[in-house]
Amino acid sequence: MISASAVKELRERTGAGMMACKKALSEANGDSEKAVEILREKGLAAAAKKAGRVASEGLVVAYVNEDGKSGAIAEVNCETDFVSANEDFKALAENIVKLAAKSNSNTVEELLEENYVDGSSKLKDVITALIAKLGENINLRRFTKFSNENGTIQSYIHGDGRIGVLVNLNADKISDEVHTLAKDICMQIAAANPLYLDETSVDQTALDKEREIYKVQALNEGKPEKIVEKMVEGRIKKYLKEVCLLDQVWVRDSDLTISKLVAKKSKELSAAISIADFVRFERGEGIEKKEENFAEEVQKQMQQSK
């Protein structure tokens, strides 16, 4: 028996119709992940990259040192948007990412043991104290940091901490134009959500899965088997252009890909420029959010403020 709540959740994840979701869940024996694949194979779930992303609250924050040689990005989560807008919570998030950028810690567990920015307590104890004060669970979910003595680090935060990007750019000459290029690349990543730098970094297992899905789609469309492989390879090429940063069309000029943009700027500035790495965080991606009645949520906040 497929529950209404399971159908509702699958519909929210994929955008497919109610009956299509119910049928997919039935075929998948209630397995929601398998149901997503079934819907994709039938062409009913167009937003594949969004599948599985359920909103959660908190902030994505970034910090780059003044010399532009190192920086960090972090996601700090809380339970409601009321707390994510709280000044104490925002200050905590900003201080966490500064600490991450300047410390030697490489894991969340290590960073939690670091002394807080004012040196008064360990980070984990500061978080615990704020939990007690605000009445919500707060946690440092993840962080990444880059350093580059032969280039520059740039960051971009979009939508009040909903999306954050950190870019590591190699450049043998640093100028305002190089910083602008790094910022443009950050905004490209925020908007177009690439999954990889280039084709050589694509996960082969993920690529094989895409290839199988495209094959099923083509067969479902009634295409002859002899041309299915050619269609699949064409769709794989299109997929790679969508998910590989260097192959993406630049959002500000459709005549340029990002690789061509970097080459163009390198020539104009007489500099050797290349993208070393990047990371993109989206608040709450992959985290299940507990649904609450809005009126009850407001009442809860009012009670906490008394």
From Swiss-Prot:
InterPro entries for this protein: EF-Ts_dimer_sf (IPR036402), Transl_elong_EFTs/EF1B (IPR001816), Transl_elong_EFTs/EF1B_dimer (IPR014039), Transl_elong_Ts_CS (IPR018101), UBA-like_sf (IPR009060)
Protein localization: Cytoplasm
The keyword Chloroplast appears for this protein: no
Keywords: Cytoplasm, Elongation factor, Protein biosynthesis
Domain of life: Bacteria
Disulfides per UniProt: none
Region annotated Involved in Mg(2+) ion dislocation from EF-Tu, chain positions: 80-83
UniProt-recorded Gene Ontology molecular function terms: translation elongation factor activity
GO CC entries: cytoplasm
Recorded family membership: Belongs to the EF-Ts family.
Protein purpose: Associates with the EF-Tu.GDP complex and induces the exchange of GDP to GTP. It remains bound to the aminoacyl-tRNA.EF-Tu.GTP complex up to the GTP hydrolysis stage on the ribosome.
PANTHER family, per database record: ELONGATION FACTOR TS (PTHR11741), ELONGATION FACTOR TS, MITOCHONDRIAL (PTHR11741:SF0)
Entry protein name: Elongation factor Ts
Organism annotation: Clostridium acetobutylicum (strain ATCC 824 / DSM 792 / JCM 1419 / IAM 19013 / LMG 5710 / NBRC 13948 / NRRL B-527 / VKM B-1787 / 2291 / W)
